[in-house]
Amino acid sequence: MIALKVPKKLPRILAASEMQAILDACTRLRDRFFFAVLHETGCRAGEVLGLRHEDIAAAESEVSIVPRESANGARAKSGGRTVPVGPELIRLYADYLHEEYGGIDSDMVFVNLWAEPKGHAWTYQAAYDLVLRLRARTGIDFDPHWCRHSAATRWLRDGVRIEVVSALLGHSSVAVTSSVYGHLTAEDARAALEKAGWFTGKEVQW
């Protein structure tokens, strides 16, 4: 008896329209910047919550993930890495600092600005509370980790080599990346072959 392989559950990703709806539902620049970083870098929520101002190199348009302890318990699950970002994200960061962050004395990028204790590092719970509010506003029952899956999927479909994607995600090996996103290679190969008419009008009939 031949056992059929059970298909692995594929990671959920956000369509561009869904991501735009989430960003547009953010009423504060801090919140919009938080999700913009998730979407642009493919970082984990804990890695973004642990960002410090020194980790954002505005001139180079880079965000660095540094493994270390943070007061809010946020941490990087993998080794350090640097992720290139676009100028739009850097401009949003500058707007956030100018319009909302102001003169708050903190090393952390994401802090309490309206809730007490003001200036303290934003917590996982605070971020989750925001997710709940955005779910209610948008009708999208999303998880922040979907931003990570979306970034990886976008990179791979745009032709970025899996070795590079693995490094950007901070995976321990390419094998880890392949185990999660390897289905994209087969899916995209099928799409290309179908577009080329490979499965129709064959000279040899089975």
PLM segments and residue spans:
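C-terminal secondary-structure termini that scaffold catalytic or DNA-interacting sites
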Residues: A196-W206
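Conserved tyrosine-mediated DNA breakage-rejoining catalytic core shared by Y-recombinases
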Residues: G50-R91
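Short, basic (Lys/Arg/His-rich) helix/loop patches that form interaction surfaces
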Residues: Y128-A167, H171-V174, E194
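Flexible interdomain linker/hinge and immediately adjacent N-terminus
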Residues: M1-A21, L113-K118
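Active-site/catalytic core of tyrosine-dependent DNA strand-transfer enzymes
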Residues: G86-I140
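Basic, Lys/Arg- and aromatic-enriched nucleic-acid-binding interface segment
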Residues: P7, A16-A45, L49, I104
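A short, basic/aromatic helix-end/turn motif that makes direct DNA contacts
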Residues: G50-I56, S166-S172, V180-H183
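Short, charged phosphate-coordinating catalytic segments
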Residues: L38-S61, E163
